[in-house]
Amino acid sequence: MDKQDIIDFFDRLAPDWDNNLIHDDVKIGAILNFAGITKGVSVLDVACGTGVLIPDYLAREVKNVVAVDISPKMIDIARIKFSGRRVKFVNADIETADIPGIFDRCVVYNAFPHFPNPQGLVHSLAGKLISGGRLTVAHGMSRKKINEHHSVSASKVSIGLMSESDLSVLFGTYFDVDIALSNKEMYVVSGIKR
């Protein structure tokens, strides 16, 4: 999977992304609870797209959010939608970008299969978190539905969503996994950095 293909794919989808989005407040609330998104924490939002989770972070009174996406058009839309000193948008490849700062929480929401090197991504994100910080990979639908959807519409830019047990093993080098959940409603793997 080529990163330029990923950029092109999401740039094409960006203009209609929000129109096609289903924002389930109950699921997102549960995911953000698992992710430890609470008042005063700093958040690194990886593959933020058009800023889908920004209102939820701000409603929880986080200290600040750095939202990163590889797609320039996704970031452009996010910047138009949200401004303020608590949110900074960065158009970059999170695996190679020099993102200033270190964070309390890192969330990868509805995006993990689009990273061609999951082990490299986990390594990179571990380096962006404080000791005791939390990394959460989550999807607002089941693993089966994600993989079915990607096999039809995004096969060129998705490696598929691995099982929660396999992702927990990848996390294990840096994180103590305390949440590994995959059901008909959502997929969440989350752990605390040692």
Which role does the model predict for each range below?
Residues 1-36, 40-49, 136-162:
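Conserved class I S-adenosyl-L-methionine
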Residues 50-96:
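Class I SAM-dependent methyltransferase SAM/SAH-binding core
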Residues 107:
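A conserved beta-strand element that flanks and buttresses the S-adenosyl-L-methionine
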Residues 120-131:
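A short glycine-rich, Lys/Arg-flanked "PGG" loop and its adjoining helix->strand segment in the class I
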Residues 158-174:
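Short alpha-helix
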Residues 176, 181-194:
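Core SAM-dependent methyltransferase catalytic element
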